[in-house]
Amino acid sequence: MEIHPDELARIKMLEETKVTSSLPGNIKPWNGHPVPVKKLDPAATLPTKANDTDAGYDLYALEDLEIGPVNQKLVKTGISMAIPKGYVGLIWPRSGLAYKHGLDVFAGVIDAGYRGDIGVILYNSKVNDHYKIKKGDRIAQILFQKIEDFDLVEVDNLDDSQRGVGGFGSSGS
């Protein structure tokens, strides 16, 4: 896996200076797992965090589009990632878009082996309003989560549990 020379220079600078609070623009300290990100389109915007304590990285729309009332669209970001093995990228809504505009994000799982365009399925819940997305708008966020690997084993019977087969509201309201 090859890291872009500009990113290597940024990492080196941060390690040498230990500067974190006075970095310009969207340059953040490199203190986590490196996740290589590739622009599939020169117009794409790389994911960013507004604050160091934010859980997710904002994802940006690659192009202008309009979502009709009670409709959904797949929005391209123009980027791909090499998420490390043992992790997954989860696509989540941005709370402001949901609250202010009724725009939701359908669940997305970006597996470590996926190398294509990270697309976001946006849903407009408004009955009468169209929603316009502009190129460069923040449309969702990606959160990285460590995952465990399991081996599924077929059995004839499962151990009993207190809940049993109760589901879909069986635990009360």
Show the residue positions of the predicted features:
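DUTPase catalytic domain/fold
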Residues: 1-173
